[in-house]
Amino acid sequence: MNNVKKESGLTMLPGQLEPVKVGRRLFLRYAGAAVAGGAVLSSCKDEENPTTVPSTVDLGTGDIGILNYAYALEQLEAAFYDQVIKTPYTGMTDAEKTLLTDIRDHEIIHREFFRAAIPAANRIADLSPNFTAINFSDRASVLGTAKAFEDLGVAAYNGAGPLIKDATYLTLAGKIVSVEARHAAAIRDLLNPKSADFAGDDIVAPTTGLDPATKPADVLPTAQKYVATPLSGASLPTA
């Protein structure tokens, strides 16, 4: 099958979500030390104690900016679940590990899709996560964070959808958000098994039956708490 070259410069395989082959049990280590945009080593009088200042990453404009925005969120989620599997919380069952491994692999697929699809000249670099607020040895801390990430991801894709101009990208975003919603429901079921929480009123509006849609300007401040690299969505479309 031949690759399709979009006018915007994005290359992808027709009808496929993942232009790269990623196995279900693929285990990729996250290069957390990489800082998007490069790290600036500030000049200081005490050369033995230099200060590393991460450069602010501008996500860009138009559809490319929205794809970079999604790429940033997928980097965050993939890094989080990778750490969860590398350092399982106390009492993690085999069933929980299997589920969380599957979610990790899905997030890696999403991350690698955006990495391959966005032209290198426009693509943001690897982001450095900041998970200091998460206790990875504690089940409640890990699953509570997973719930927050998945709910945020669903709302972010829903909010970004109307900002995407290219129909192909919009379709792909719709496919990804459907998977993210499945993740959100699965995590909620782990926290409160066999309850209505998998699609609770706190996340699905009773009057519309829809998940929330949150604009990038409202999503980024929450995501930034878990990303050491400063992000700027100032140039992203708003309508």
Placement of each model-derived feature along the sequence:
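All-alpha RGS (Regulator of G-protein Signaling) helical domain and cognate RGS-like helical scaffolds
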Residues: N2-K21, A31-A33, D46-A239
